[in-house]
């Protein structure tokens, strides 16, 4: 549920992005290879996250705009050339102009289009969840592109990665917290009431990067499903 939450990376992933920066400075003279670059991104300051856009749609779906700049490395250039050869330069540019980080197809799917990855989140019980990761090879693309996908999946999303262990720890603490005798309410109030209707082709609602719009949107959809409120009007308030 923290996929499109921009409040957690700089705190939750501090240990991993600081380790990446330390290794880069001490061992690589400041060079930041791909494996470290994708870890380092979590250390961007709060202003960076606030400037992202969060889009939410009816029935709990949402996505976050990209946190990495459009790559211009030799592999990305070779991929564009192969795509342009198959689809034409205009269509290739249009395809690659769709730049998103995390996408949530509520309740259980999360495609990551930049790295050809698809995650399926399967609840097993109230405190057990199975996460399956699928990677895709793009027909006609340079074979090194698939290797980059594997690297991203292993470094960022693998259960044994130094990034995912941060998230798993947070999930475990949330589960523990919900069993305590504390308050019954879980706050989702960041930027509540400030989200706006999006007038672009996508429709839906849009909030700035610090908004908790995506999680409010998910809980609103969950409530609709539990109460069978199929005809309830789409609202930004959540529940």
Language-model regions, residue ranges each:
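Rieske [2Fe-2S] iron-sulfur-binding subdomain
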Residues: 1-239
